[in-house]
Amino acid sequence: MNEAVERHDLKILGTSSSVGGVFKDVKVTGECTFGGDVDCHKLAQTGEVAIKGNLRAQDIKITGECEVKGRVDAASLRGQGELTAGGGLRIEDIKLTGGIIVTGDCEAEQVQLTGILEVSGLLNAEKLDLTLFGPCRADTVGGGRISIKRSRSGALLRPGKKLSFTARLIEGDQIELQHTQAQTVRGGSIVIGPGCEIETVEYREVLEVHKSSIVRNTVKM
């Protein structure tokens, strides 16, 4: 984060636009389009924000939709809504109800997400706690403790869509899955809950498989 530039707050009320730049705190109530990069201490939005460059912040709090064409780098993300990152995402601590859509890799220390997650590349988190409210996917999932479960209260589903998580590879130390489809699941302690379809499970310590799930191959490492 650029600290050599003097920072000022930016407040947007209603519908407006900005070229972007370096700010202290950015607060948007309404709609705002930033034409370039945004570098700030805090972004707080209620409504819709579009950033045509990269977003770099300490804290992000969203209520609504935030679309970033470039990369997102932040220490924390909180709120209710949807964040889209077109050039990858790195946020240390995520706690969100809504959706995260990333083109590229998504890296975090902790992720607590209730909603929808789409990552075209690697989803890497030391602790991942995902509650499915719709179809979710990632190419590869890696981490320490991974928990993927289905919401009990309902689903945001389009006709013909399954409430499931899909990945090519899921790898972690402790893994607990529900309603997940994967080619390979690899880890230490693995619990395959209801509604899963896994081609191969490779485990070091413990493997439990729910009677409603399908695991075609198991390998004790």
Q: Residue spans of the language-model regions?
A:
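Extended beta-solenoid/beta-helix repeat architectures
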Residues: 1-221
